Amino acid sequence: LTDTFTYTLSDEHDATDTATLTITLLGQDNEAPSATDNTNAVNEDETVTVTNGTSGVTGDVLINDTDPESDTLTVTKIKKSGGSDSNVSSGSSYNSSGTSVTGTYGTLTIGADGSYTYTADQDAADALDAGDTENDVFVYTVSDGNGGTDTANITITVTGTNEPPVAVDDTDAVNE
């Protein structure tokens, strides 16, 4: 962006001179990216994996995030809702140096590329009856690499399943 001004100087003897001042704006303020909440669902005894760029799957944390300058976005932090931030290693994916955070009903592992996996913890989810649902909520930070950041939630809905009873063979002896 360039702006030009013409100005005239004069002295006490009425002598004048005209010049031009040109101002060129070399940079602009970086605008922060916009992170959008994500959702996914899993049964209490399953794992859900979402890889970067998977279209049509709600949960890929970068595919629905935007940046006004079209900067490349990365995930830089993750935490359980209400917990403390954990840094996410740059260049990582969920299965290669990803950062793991334990929630109430399972563990989320996320990479800087936005890919993640959530593994439900069977023992933690045993309290859920068949068909009952509870949410595990995580907060991630997305960065544009130029100082702009935003946060959004990853909400995993965990559904209880009906675990069949386990029969154990027994033996006993009785006197006649």
Segments from the language model and where they lie:
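Extracellular ectodomain surface segments
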Residues: 30-101, 163-176
